[in-house]
Amino acid sequence: MVRKLKTHEQKLLKKTDFMSWQVDQQGKQGDMLRKFYVKKREHYALYNTLAAKSREVADLIKNLSESDPFRSKCTEDMLTKFYAAGLVPTSDTLERIGKVTGASFARRRLPVVMRNIGMCESVKTASDLVEQGHVRIGTKLVTDPAFMVTRSSEDMITWTKASKIKKHVMDYNNTRDDFDLMD
């Protein structure tokens, strides 16, 4: 017979669900969560499942015969989409898709791309700035740090017009216009 839980033990176990839990690689996943500053573990689990599914599809396409026109069309389409999303460095062979991991998806998050292009010093700072509404992509304001940035939209990442950070950067670079001072 099991004893009745004390009050503090019940409070600790209140949010624990013993019926459904995810089996994952705690050590490696924790490192990736810290490296890419992913706040929700479910997001990284989703990236891993997307990578696994894409590897499965790539393996299915590889199993088709070389002379099959469907194989060449699917290979070309899949490589084009993965290259446009920024998940593979070049779109030459199907083996590139076989090497896609959850980290490949995490590298395309907006804060990580901002750090890579030099807008911020760290991913954490970039994530905070995105959540506070300082960043836009094209004309669209983005406040979700889990936003996936494609290669084409990578060049359109800028500070919002009303952002104080943009004003400080323009003052530092001596590029602030008199017209901008009126805003």
Swiss-Prot record:
PROSITE patterns: S4. InterPro entries: Ribosomal_uS4, Ribosomal_uS4_N, S4_RNA-bd, S4_RNA-bd_sf. The keyword RNA-binding applies. Keywords: Nucleus, Ribonucleoprotein, Ribosome biogenesis, RNA-binding, rRNA-binding. It is found in: Nucleus, Nucleolus. Residues 108-174 form the S4 RNA-binding domain. This is U3 small nucleolar ribonucleoprotein protein imp3. It comes from Caenorhabditis elegans. The lineage of its organism: Eukaryota, Metazoa, Ecdysozoa, Nematoda, Chromadorea.
